[in-house]
Amino acid sequence: MAVSTQQLAEELQIFGLDCEDSLLEKLAELCTLYRQTEERMVSELIAFCTSAGKSCLTGEILSSFEHEVLNKKLSKACHSASKDNRHAGARDIVSIQELIEAEEEEETLLSAYTTPSKGPHKRVSSTPETPLTKRSISTRSPHQLLSPSSFSPSATPSQKYSSRTNRGEVVTTFGSAQGVSWSGRGGSGSISLKVMGYPEPLTSSYKTMFQQLPDIREVLTCKIEELGSELKEHYKIEAFTPLLVPAQEPVILLGQIGCDSNGRLNSKSVILEGDREHSSGAQIPVDVSELKDYSLFPGQVVIMEGFNTTGRRLTATKLYEGVPLPFYQPTEEEGDFEQTMVLVACGPYTTSDSITYDPLLDLISTINHDRPDVCILFGPFLDAKHEQVENCKLTSPFEDIFKQCLRTVIEGTRSSGSHLVFVPSLRDVHHEPVYPQPPFTFSELPREDKKRVQFVSEPCNLSINGVMFGLTSTDLLFHIGAEEICSSSGTSDRFSRILKHILTQRSYYPLYPPHEDMAIDYENFYTYAQLPVTPDVFIVPSELRYFVKDIFGCVCMNPGRLTKGQVGGTFGRLYLRRQPKGTDSEGRQGLSVAAQVVRI
C-alpha cells in the first residue's frame, strides 16, 4: 500500500493542523505499518489530539498515538480474527451459494481463454500449424516483447507514472559520492561473481510441506544454543542458570523472546523460552520495567541478567548486546580490483493501476546509459498482489509473462554488457512461495548471455570481486518493525535497531513466529538462510522509506521499490573501491563505498 505524504499534509490542513516534513514521514511509516489509509489515519489522529487537548503535532504526540491507539486497535483486530478463523472452515463448506459463484467465476475464466477475440486486436496464436518461431521473438524490441496487449487486452499506461516530473532525482546519498561519475564499464571490466554457501548455496527446488513440529523446535533450539555459546565466550560468562530455579542472587539466563498470547508483543507479555541444555525448553515471564534501554521481538535470542527469587518470574536488570560475525576476507585475486559500480532495483516493475512494464523499460534505458558492472534485480517481477493478478484479468499464463520480462531485460541490456543477477521474491506469483526460495529457472537463456546472467536464491550471499553482498527480497524491516517493542532513554532510530538485530542474530529472518506471508521450511532455513559472515553491503528492500546506513561497518541499503502504487519509485546504485594496501577499523582491506538512491 503506497502512502503519499502530500495527501497526509492535505488531510491535516483540512483540520488546520500543520506538520513538519519529518513528522509526515513518520506518519506515512505508521500508515504502512498499521495498514491504514491517509484519510483514516488522519481522522484517528485528530480524534486523539482533540480528546487529549493538543493543538499542535509533535514527535511525542505521535509516539503516544501509536502506543495508545494504533497498538491497541491492532491487538483487538488480531484477537477477533483468531476467533473468526475457528469457524471459517465450516462456513466455507456449507455455503452452497459461494460454491455456485465460484463455479461461475471458473466458467468465466475458461471462456476468456477459449473464446477467440474479434476485431483488429486479435492476438497471434501459436499452434502446431503456425508456431511462433524463435527468430520472430528475438527480433522484437523490448517494447514489443512487453507489449501489454499480448497478455492483458484492457491494459493502459499509468497516467500518474508517465506524468512524473522528478525522474533522476537523487533522494539520499552515502559516503563520498561527490565527483563520482556513476558510470561503469559494463562488460569490459573484470568481474568475479561467486555465490557463497556454507556448506553450499541453494541451487534447485526441494520438497516442501514435509516438516513436523519437532523439526521446527530442533532448529530453534540449535539456534539458541549456537548463539548462546558465542555470547558466553564473548562476555566470559561462566555458566547459565536454569530458568525455573529460584535464586536470591542475580542470575544470567539464556533463551528466546516469546509472547504469552496470540496478540502482538508488548512490555507486559514478554516471556523467555529457555534452551534445552540448561532449562529443558521451559518458559518464564519477564518483567522489563527495570531495563532502561531495550529492543525486543519474538524469536530474538538473548542473554538476560536479573532476579528470579521465586523461579516463576524474572525481573530483568541487564540485557547483553548481540555480537556480529567477522567480515569476509577476500583472496588476493578477489581483492585485486580498482572500482566497481553496482545497480540494485526491487519490484514491482509495474504500477498498481496498470500491467504495462513502463518502469522496467525505463530501468533498462538507465542501465544502457550508465553501463553498471553488475545489476541486481529483485522480484517480484509479476506481483501476486497486483490487482489484475488477484482478479484473474490476465489472458496469458503467469510463467509466460515472467519469461517475457526476463527476455526483455536480458536482450535489452545486452549492448551494455552489464552482469545481471536475478533474486526471486515470495510475491512472484509464478514461483515457489517457500522460504528459502530456490533460484528462477530459464531454460531459454541464449548461449551468448550465460556468462553475464546469474539466477540466485532468496536469500543469498554474493561475492562481487571479493566484496560480500547480503541479498534478500523479503521485507525484513516491515515484518520485524511491526512486532518489535523498545524503550530508549534517548533518540532511537527504528531502522538501525532492526538492522543491528539482523546482523547480531546472524540470520536473514530471525523473527518467530514468522509473518503471515511467510511459508518457511525450517530445515532448509537452518542450512541456507543464516549469515555466514557480516556482509560488506546488505541490500534490504522494503515498503518503508529508502535509506543507506552504516551498521557495524556494514553498508545497509533499502533502495525502495521501483514503483510505489501508481507513481514511480526509486532504485539504488553503489560505487565500490578497494585500496591495494592497508586495512580499515574493522580489519578489512580498505573498502570505500559511495551510494545513492535515485528516482526512476
From Swiss-Prot:
Phosphoserine modification, residue list: S126, S141, S147, S152, S154
Annotated Low complexity bias: 141-158
Molecular-function annotations in GO: DNA binding; DNA-directed DNA polymerase activity
Compositionally biased residues, Polar residues: 125-140
GO BP field: DNA replication; DNA replication initiation; DNA replication, synthesis of primer; protein import into nucleus
Primary localisation category: nucleus
Region called Disordered, residue ranges: 112-167
Domain of life (superkingdom): Eukaryota
Location relative to the cell: Nucleus
Keywords: DNA replication, Nucleus, Phosphoprotein
List of residues that carry Phosphothreonine: T127, T130
GO cellular component terms attached to this protein's record: alpha DNA polymerase:primase complex; nucleus
Changes after translation: Phosphorylated in a cell cycle-dependent manner, in G2/M phase.
InterPro entries, per database record: DNA_pol_a/d/e_bsu, DNA_pol_alpha_B_N_sf, DNA_pol_alpha_bsu, DPOA2_OB, Pol_alpha_B_N
Family stated for the protein in its record: Belongs to the DNA polymerase alpha subunit B family.
Function recorded in the entry: Accessory subunit of the DNA polymerase alpha complex (also known as the alpha DNA polymerase-primase complex) which plays an essential role in the initiation of DNA synthesis. During the S phase of the cell cycle, the DNA polymerase alpha complex (composed of a catalytic subunit POLA1, an accessory subunit POLA2 and two primase subunits, the catalytic subunit PRIM1 and the regulatory subunit PRIM2) is recruited to DNA at the replicative forks via direct interactions with MCM10 and WDHD1.
Subunit organization: Component of the alpha DNA polymerase complex (also known as the alpha DNA polymerase-primase complex) consisting of four subunits: the catalytic subunit POLA1, the regulatory subunit POLA2, and the primase complex subunits PRIM1 and PRIM2 respectively. Within the complex, POLA1 directly interacts with PRIM2.
Name of the protein in its database record: DNA polymerase alpha subunit B
